[in-house]
Curated annotation (Swiss-Prot):
GO terms for biological process: translation. Keywords: Ribonucleoprotein, Ribosomal protein. This is Large ribosomal subunit protein bL17. PANTHER family: LARGE RIBOSOMAL SUBUNIT PROTEIN BL17M (PTHR14413:SF16), RIBOSOMAL PROTEIN L17 (PTHR14413). Belongs to the bacterial ribosomal protein bL17 family. It comes from Solidesulfovibrio magneticus (strain ATCC 700980 / DSM 13731 / RS-1) (Desulfovibrio magneticus). InterPro entries: Ribosomal_bL17, Ribosomal_bL17_sf. GO terms for cellular component: cytosolic large ribosomal subunit. SUPFAM superfamilies: Prokaryotic ribosomal protein L17 (SSF64263).
Length: 138
């Protein structure tokens, strides 16, 4: 019986699943938004949340822990210098999974978009862009 077993197997061996989640975490941290199946997105969420939590404490040990997953010095530097400071003071919820309305064409798999909640070019939550006045365009 499979009672109380957390995590999805995703139809892969343990090594393949680990490699796939590492690659997807790299892609998400580079592009900040990726499209994948719903179940993969939900599994990836936990990996990326742990990495962003690590990035909030900038220490050598935290960088080495992140490097164990990412295996890329430039990406670790980006995680700790750009992505981590964006979420300072936020106790979780760094990613969002948005379900897409149409399934994948080939096998009808449920698709989703996983993204960081605070994207790179977005304005902070308290500062919205003021709409332009029509009278000032003279």
């Amino acid at each position: 019986m499979r009672h109380n077993k957390s995590g999805r197997k995703l139809g892969r061996t343990a090594a393949h699943r680990k490699a796939m989640l590492r690659n997807m975490a790299r892609s998400l941290l580079i592009h900040e938004r990726i499209r994948t199946t719903e179940h993969k997105a939900k599994e990836l969420r936990g990996v990326v949340e742990q990495l962003v939590t690590l990035a909030q404490t900038d220490s050598v040990h935290a960088r080495r822990m992140a490097y164990k997953v990412l295996e890329n010095h430039q990406l670790v530097a980006r995680l700790f210098n750009e992505i981590g400071p964006r979420f300072t003071g936020q106790p979780g919820g760094y990613t969002r999974v948005v379900k897409m309305s149409l399934p994948r064409a080939g096998d009808c798999a449920a698709m989703a978009i996983i993204e960081l909640t605070k994207l790179a070019g977005a304005a902070p939550a308290g500062q919205e862009q003021a709409p332009k006045d029509a009278s000032s365009e003279a």
